[in-house]
Amino acid sequence: MTMLATIQRFCRRTGLPVPATVAGSTDSQVVQLQALLEEEGQDLARRGAWQGITFEATHTSVATESQGAITSIATNGFNYIKNQTIWDRTENLPIIGPVSSEVWQALKGSVSTGPRFQFRIRGGLLIVNPVPTANHTWAFEYVSKNWILAANGTTYKEYFTADTDTMLLPEELLMMGLRWRWKKEKGLDYAEDMRTYEMQVKDALGRDGGKPVLHMDHESGRSPSPGIFVPQGSWSIP
C-alpha cells in the first residue's frame, strides 16, 4: 500500500478529511500524519529483523585486516548484521563472529593465527583476523533501516518523498501504530490502542518470514549433518 493510500485509509477510519495528496502538502494535519507515519515506521523497523527489510550483501575480500566501511559493503541503509550469516563462498566456510572485544584482543595478542577467520564491526569498519586471502567472495544478511520503497522498485529510503512510495513493513501494524500515536498527539486516550498494537507486533514478529521448528532432542529432521548414521532399531545382532 502506498503512503497516500495509507493516510487516506486512516482518515476515513478516523472521520478526518481525506486528502487528495500528502507529499508536499501544506495542510498542517496532513503534514502531521505523514510525520507520525514515518515515526511509526522507523520505530517498527527497529523492533526486529523483519523479512521485508532483510537484504543480502556480497563482498570481495581484500588482503588487509579492514575490509572497509560496513555501510559501503551493505549499501542499502545498513542497520545491523544478522549473526552467523557471513560465509566465504569461495572456500565454503563460515566467517566466525561477531566476536566480543575480549576475544578480539585475545586474537590480536596471540602469537599464532587462525585457522578460522573471525570478524567484528568496530568504528564502522568490518575487520577480520587473521588477514584473509584476497578476491574471495563473502556474503551475509543484514537488516536495513530503509523501510520505504519508491515506485521505481529499486530506490529504498527511510523517509517519504512521494505519494507513490510503498512500505515494506506490515501495513496493519503501521496503521495501528499511526492510530495510537495520533491519539497521543491529540491528547486523547490511547492506552488501549497501544496495548493492542504491542500485542499484534509481538505476534507478527513471531510469524514474520516463517520460523524453523525447534527440536529439543537436537534432531534437525530434514537437514541431517554429514556423518555416520545409526538406525534407531532393527539392528542385526549375531
Regions found by a protein language model. Give the residues of each.
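Glycine-enriched, solvent-exposed interface loops adjoining structured elements
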Residues: M1-P238
